[in-house]
């Protein structure tokens, strides 16, 4: 804890995505007067945080004192909001931790099913009724997906209609599954409990075009100018999507986005060493006058 602020109230504060909290002065007070301190902007300089460099280490490197680390957070909004940058080697495992689910690119067409008698058995078979995913009442967040060949099921966590993509917490979905089946939560949970269980009610199916681990899935697609683009779709009902209209050259994965964001976090403003004591003293004065 910095010696300069011991007289002020402290709270357990979590910076961005940091896993642990830091005992830090109440940021409500600090941020309220930050605009007054920024009159010292002429005394700042840009700094690129080195791989693995921690706040206290950088404070000592710049000022010969570990207690000035707090200035980095107060001067840089993105550090307060997003946390201190990760070590490069930690970005990939952190992406796997942050994005643990399965993502499906689908054709966006729900093929309805109905019960029929085949060779004396009652089975669910496709009808000739097709609906865009936007109009489906079963391919919705909160329902479950069943993957017959993999014998697994999972909850629908999110649907992006513009990208024709579905997020699910299903574990163990294999490439042999080219279709997913919409089932109720009750039946999805039954499959999770017993992989040999076959759902009785299989209301609709949808074609799977691509499958990714979430961290490796497209967060979005970009053109050469960095503008976001989306898979094209047919103007003819039921409006199937064409995922070949975008490719890996256009894709920015969740991992790549985290990597890019981590690089941005490394670019900060720091107070020049010959001005640090003056700025800190003035900041302390402002803190006292605000109480």
Provide a role label for each language-model segment.
Residues 1-291:
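Cell-surface/extracellular proteins and modules involved
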């Amino acid at each position: 804890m910095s010696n300069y602020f011991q007289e002020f109230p402290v709270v357990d504060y979590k910076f961005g995505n940091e896993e642990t909290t830091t005992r830090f002065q109440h940021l409500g007070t600090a941020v309220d007067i930050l605009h007054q301190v920024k009159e010292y902007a002429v005394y700042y300089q840009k700094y690129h945080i080195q791989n693995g460099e921690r706040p206290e280490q950088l404070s000592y490197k710049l000022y010969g004192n570990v207690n000035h680390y707090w200035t980095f957070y107060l001067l840089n909004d993105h550090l307060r909001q997003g946390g201190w940058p990760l070590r490069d080697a930690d970005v990939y495992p952190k992406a796997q931790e942050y994005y643990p689910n399965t993502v499906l690119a689908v054709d966006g067409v729900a093929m309805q099913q109905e019960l029929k008698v085949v060779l004396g058995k009652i089975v669910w078979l496709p009808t000739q009724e097709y609906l865009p995913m936007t109009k489906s009442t079963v391919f919705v967040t909160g329902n479950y997906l069943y993957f017959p060949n993999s014998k697994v099921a999972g909850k629908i966590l999110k649907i992006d209609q513009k990208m024709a993509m579905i997020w699910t917490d299903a574990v163990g979905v294999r490439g042999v599954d080219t279709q997913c089946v919409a089932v109720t939560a009750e039946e999805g949970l039954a499959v999770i409990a017993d992989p040999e269980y076959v759902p009785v009610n299989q209301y609709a199916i949808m074609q799977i075009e691509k499958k990714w681990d979430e961290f490796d899935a497209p967060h979005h697609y970009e053109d050469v100018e960095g503008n976001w683009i989306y898979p094209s779709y047919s103007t003819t009902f039921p409006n199937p999507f064409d995922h070949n209209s975008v490719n890996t050259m256009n894709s920015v994965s969740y991992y790549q986005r985290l990597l890019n964001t981590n690089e941005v976090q490394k670019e900060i403003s720091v107070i020049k060493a010959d001005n640090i004591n003056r700025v800190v003293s003035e900041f302390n004065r402002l803190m006292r006058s605000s109480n």
